Amino acid sequence: MDKKAARIRRATRARRKLQELGATRLVVHRTPRHIYAQVIAPNGSEVLVAASTVEKAIAEQLKSTGNKDAATAIGKAIAERALEKGIKNVSFDRSGFQYHGRVQALADAAREAGLQF
């Protein structure tokens, strides 16, 4: 089993558990160059809010789109957008990535901005 397959296996297991709970999920995906965050409805078929470093408005404010500063900016942005839509409580779905570095920075920034998980 290669590294990507192991990550996907971890992500699938966590998503199944969150689906059983019927929770609204804050999903994080990262690549070496960008980081993405989405708030997904409990049924899993609808993206309620999204933010990523691909967005021109956010990318222009950042020196680099693939570091902790970028992850912090995305965490704040996703929290602000979720709160505008009335979403306060979410379950954090790290997509099988380690809770470290950019993933942790995004989560911490979202918590500081008012999301609860």
From Swiss-Prot:
Biological processes annotated in GO: translation
InterPro entries: Ribosomal_uL18_bac-type, Ribosomal_uL18_bac/euk
Gene this chain is encoded by: rplR
NCBIfam families in alphabetical order: L18_bact
An example molecular function term from Gene Ontology annotations: 5S rRNA binding
Gene3D superfamilies assigned to the protein according to its UniProt record, in alphabetical order: 3.30.420.100
Keyword set includes Transferase: no
Primary role: This is one of the proteins that bind and probably mediate the attachment of the 5S RNA into the large ribosomal subunit, where it forms part of the central protuberance.
This protein's UniProt keywords: Ribonucleoprotein, Ribosomal protein, RNA-binding, rRNA-binding
Family to which this protein belongs: Belongs to the universal ribosomal protein uL18 family.
Species assigned in the record: Pectobacterium atrosepticum (strain SCRI 1043 / ATCC BAA-672)
Subunit details: Part of the 50S ribosomal subunit; part of the 5S rRNA/L5/L18/L25 subcomplex. Contacts the 5S and 23S rRNAs.
UniProt protein name: Large ribosomal subunit protein uL18
Cellular component GO terms held in the UniProt record: cytosolic large ribosomal subunit
